[in-house]
């Protein structure tokens, strides 16, 4: 049995959270997973670790964690892997991210019985280009 955890960045704006939650609803409807949870890097609850723990409570063997980010960055290469207890692909010595916003993030690795499988971010995909074209048409009033 497989559970899914979608990871959003988190924001003070409620819309950001609602978007990730709506994507989770679609994944739950379209996929065949035991449960689909949502966790956030910062500024929103639940945390990534809380979402993974909740997913594990459903008794699954594997939890697939999917960053709902377009591309890799410090969060997907370093921060999320740390939270999952996985080896980060980003060396802290390479970190020029200090100028960026730093909120009080908990990097304590989550401890669950299930195997954690870490997926790639969304990436360049023709389906995303279709959405971009839809947004262009909407902006031009050509819906």
Curated annotation (Swiss-Prot):
Keywords: Cobalamin biosynthesis, Cobalt, Lyase, Metal-binding, Methanogenesis, Nickel. Ni(2+) binds at residues 9, 75. The active site is at 9 (proton acceptor). GO terms for molecular function: cobalt ion binding; nickel cation binding; sirohydrochlorin cobaltochelatase activity. Its EC number is 4.99.1.3, 4.99.1.11. The keyword Metal-binding applies. Substrate binds at residues 45, 70-75. Catalyzes the insertion of Co(2+) into sirohydrochlorin as part of the anaerobic pathway to cobalamin biosynthesis. Involved in the biosynthesis of the unique nickel-containing tetrapyrrole coenzyme F430, the prosthetic group of methyl-coenzyme M reductase (MCR), which plays a key role in methanogenesis and anaerobic methane oxidation. Catalyzes the insertion of Ni(2+) into sirohydrochlorin to yield Ni-sirohydrochlorin. Homotetramer; dimer of dimers. NCBIfam families: F430_CfbA, PRK00923.1. This is Sirohydrochlorin cobaltochelatase. It comes from Methanopyrus kandleri (strain AV19 / DSM 6324 / JCM 9639 / NBRC 100938). The lineage of its organism: Archaea, Methanobacteriati, Methanobacteriota, Methanomada group, Methanopyri. The gene is cbiX.
């Amino acid at each position: 049995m497989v559970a899914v955890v979608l990871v959003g960045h988190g924001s003070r704006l409620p819309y950001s959270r609602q978007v990730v939650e709506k994507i989770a609803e679609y994944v739950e409807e379209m996929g065949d997973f035991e449960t689909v949870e949502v966790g956030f890097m910062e500024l929103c609850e639940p945390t990534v670790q809380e979402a993974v723990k909740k997913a594990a409570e459903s008794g699954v063997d594997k939890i697939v964690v999917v960053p709902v980010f377009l591309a890799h960055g410090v969060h997907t290469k370093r921060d999320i892997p740390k939270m999952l207890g996985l080896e980060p692909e980003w060396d802290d010595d390479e970190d020029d991210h200090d100028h960026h916003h730093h909120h009080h993030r908990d990097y304590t690795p989550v401890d669950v019985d299930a195997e954690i499988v870490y997926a790639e971010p969304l990436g360049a995909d023709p389906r995303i280009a279709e959405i971009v074209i839809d947004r262009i048409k909407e902006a031009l009033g050509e819906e």
